[in-house]
Amino acid sequence: MTTSESSSTSSVKIYFRLLSYVRPHVGIFLLSIIGFVIFASTQPMLAGILKYFVDGLTNPEAVLFPNVPYLRELQLLQAVPLLIVLIAAWQGLGSFLGNYFLAKVSLGLVHDLRVELFNKLLVLPNRYFDTTNSGHLISRITFNVTMVTGAATDAIKVVIREGLTVVFLFIYLLMMNWKLTLVMLAILPLIAVMVGSASKKFRKQSKKIQVAMGDVTHVASETIQGYRVVRSFGGESYEQNRFAQASDSNTRKQLRMTKTGAIYTPMLQLVIYSAMAVLMFLVLFLRGDATAGDLVAYITAAGLLPKPIRQLSEVSSTIQKGVAGAESIFEQLDVEEEVDTGTIERDRVTGHLEVKNLSFFYPQTERQVLNDISFSAAPGQMIALVGRSGSGKSTLANLIPRFYGHEMGNILLDGVEINDYRLRNLRKHIAQVNQNVTLFNDTIANNIAYGDLAGAPRADIEAAAADAYAKEFIDQLPQGFDTQVGENGVLLSGGQRQRLAIARALLKNAPLLILDEATSALDTESERHIQAALDHVMKGRTTLVIAHRLSTIEKADMILVMDAGQIVERGTHTELLAQNGYYARLHAMGLDEPSPVGAV
């Protein structure tokens, strides 16, 4: 099979998969088809009525239906105007049914695709987000889905309505003069070749447009999210140029596709009207005993063909845009979800954590991030991880809730390998607070009682906020716990946002607590309050702390000093200071990043 044949087969498969999304709306879709059948049937009727109109010019008193009871007295003078009104009403009914119900199908399909895409995002593995541009992800949900909808509904509308129009007109023409009509059919192979050639170009250009649109979304998203950095470092000109380049690239690709259509459509029209010219010559040359009305009706019906044929040829552009968009959408929908082969579920674990000979490589890289890590933590113990950036602390913390899967070594929770737990059940037992706090554009109460915590009693929410020393600033807000925090908590200070994240973790009341630089954004007074709250909440819970501040880790039952993915020292704060090694140097520098072990 050649590359072009393979690509054509792939396009057909993608398109039929796309059409499968119409299935839930098949009842409404059938109503729209009925409407388009009604609409298409009126086209030969309009041509036919002209026959009687022209014949009526010479004999207006002739009857229209001489052999039909009750209508045999109806003269052309009366019948032609009446039939025109009836045909127009019939056409209007078909147009309404077709357009309205197809619009319902279209909007339903947009909704279904967007929801499925978004739901898929929620179950994709972390590595997918690490390697995929966020702007492209957003563009698929917004821009690509719209293009796909055009292929699945608007294109079908044209194919059905204009296709049936062509069929009905050809049937009418064959009934009037089949020999002349066969002459017209001779141009169809040429039209098919032209449509096929244009389709390949449209699909290729559509893919490029989608990538360019994703780049536009990505640049805009990055700039909006990082607007403080942009302004602080005078990056306005740089971002303006970057966005202008992305937008210009998208514009040029759009123009290239428009140019293809602008060249292709007139060429197709030239072919069709050339065939019409030949047909008119033959009609005049071979008129035989046909009446003037017959000739006018035939020419009119033939003259109605170019418009639907042209629209059918142009629908290729819409379909290829949709196929290109659907390809990227289905690629995302087909990505393997987070691996969850576990079968064990427990209502509550004690929090006994044990790591044995754990090594880890990030997917698709050769760089070893963790090397033969082993330690254990009993319930109620606090384990602190310290070391310079890139030493593997956060990676280790991300492996415990299975944000990434490990293959070398073991991580045991209550003596059970974490891969043997059902993923949702495992994460139910873990509360995590990161340095980069995520808050949603909702109320303070809803941000604390988020996800599985939604519906928690207000008293529990307020108690968690009080334990995190967040209630003191919440009570000062105009609407208290019902205050909107803005996008990602933009209306709150860094310390306030961090305290809300800690309150969320406290409300979860999980037996395993992971604090990844959780107090780094707090001022000294807030940190003192939080430390007191954490001392209370860590009782009976296993706590894994990653921190740069001495006050956060001095009380740890065990400190693991990490460098280059290995544990280079372990012990209590006092024991490690006595060793006068790597940790002692960290301590002397206030837990800033020293040079690596072995450096002079």
Curated annotation (Swiss-Prot):
The keyword Cell membrane applies. Residues 353-589 form the ABC transporter domain. Residues 30-321 form the ABC transmembrane type-1 domain. It catalyses: ATP + H2O + lipid A-core oligosaccharideSide 1 = ADP + phosphate + lipid A-core oligosaccharideSide 2. Its EC number is 7.5.2.6. ATP binds at residues 387-394. Keywords: ATP-binding, Cell inner membrane, Cell membrane, Lipid transport, Membrane, Nucleotide-binding, Translocase, Transmembrane, Transmembrane helix, Transport. Belongs to the ABC transporter superfamily. Lipid exporter (TC 3.A.1.106) family. This is ATP-dependent lipid A-core flippase. It comes from Pseudomonas savastanoi pv. phaseolicola (strain 1448A / Race 6) (Pseudomonas syringae pv. phaseolicola (strain 1448A / Race 6)). The lineage of its organism: Bacteria, Pseudomonadati, Pseudomonadota, Gammaproteobacteria, Pseudomonadales. The gene is msbA.
